[in-house]
C-alpha cells in the first residue's frame, strides 16, 4: 500500500501519524510524508497593493522547521518498520497533497481533520475538505486526537 501523509505541527497531524502505526502493516506499506510551506506575505500589505514577500531567510527558516517536523515523523514510522520518504514542498498544502498523491500513485491519502491554523470550517479544515474533493485516491481524515 502507498500512503501519502499530510503533516504539519498540529495535534491532528500527529494523530494521523499514530493511526498509520496502529492500523497499517509496515512490511506492506510505503509512507510519503508531505509538508507544504506557503510563501507568506506581510500582514501589512494594503488590499489593493501588491503583496510583499517575506525575506528569503524567513522562508528558509520555516522550511527547515517543516523538514525537522517531517524527520521526526519519519523516524517514528521507521522505528515501527515502515518504509518512508519525505517531501517538503513550496506552496499550498492542498495542492501539494493532491499532486503528491497523484505522482506517487497513492492508494490512500491521510490527513488530520484540522491543521495548525486552528480555523475550523463546519466539520473539516480547509485542507481536509479540499483533498477529500480532489484527491485521486481514497482519503482518510483522522479526527480523534492521539
Please place each PLM-identified region on the residue numbering.
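Short secondary-structure boundary segments
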Residues: 35, 112-114, 144
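Structural beta-alpha unit
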Residues: 75-109, 146
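General small-molecule cofactor/ligand-binding pocket signal
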Residues: 32-34, 85-89, 140
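A short acidic, glycine-rich active-site loop
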Residues: 52-68
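Small/aliphatic-rich secondary-structure junction motif
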Residues: 1-54, 82
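Glycine-rich, Arg-bearing micro-motifs that act as flexible, cationic patches
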Residues: 108-133
